[in-house]
């Protein structure tokens, strides 16, 4: 038995461009809190690549910068409720 294919349930996936690559960034500074907050949820979690469109290299640099900013005290470990 084959299932009927419903076209309304299929979604086209668009290739997301990495904002850091398109802007020409080489590294991510942990002191740039406004940029880091764009990639963090309200709860303080780092957003995944599939949502943000960040490349794998910059996702690793982003995670490292967020963790450094948390330890220094620039970003909270847990977001406000």
Curated annotation (Swiss-Prot):
It holds the Pfam family Ribosomal_S18. GO terms for biological process: translation. GO terms for molecular function: small ribosomal subunit rRNA binding; structural constituent of ribosome. Keywords: Ribonucleoprotein, Ribosomal protein, RNA-binding, rRNA-binding. GO terms for cellular component: cytosolic small ribosomal subunit. InterPro entries: Ribosomal_bS18 (IPR001648), Ribosomal_bS18_CS (IPR018275), Ribosomal_bS18_sf (IPR036870). Part of the 30S ribosomal subunit. Forms a tight heterodimer with protein bS6. Binds as a heterodimer with protein bS6 to the central domain of the 16S rRNA, where it helps stabilize the platform of the 30S subunit. Belongs to the bacterial ribosomal protein bS18 family. This is Small ribosomal subunit protein bS18. It comes from Chlamydia trachomatis serovar D (strain ATCC VR-885 / DSM 19411 / UW-3/Cx).
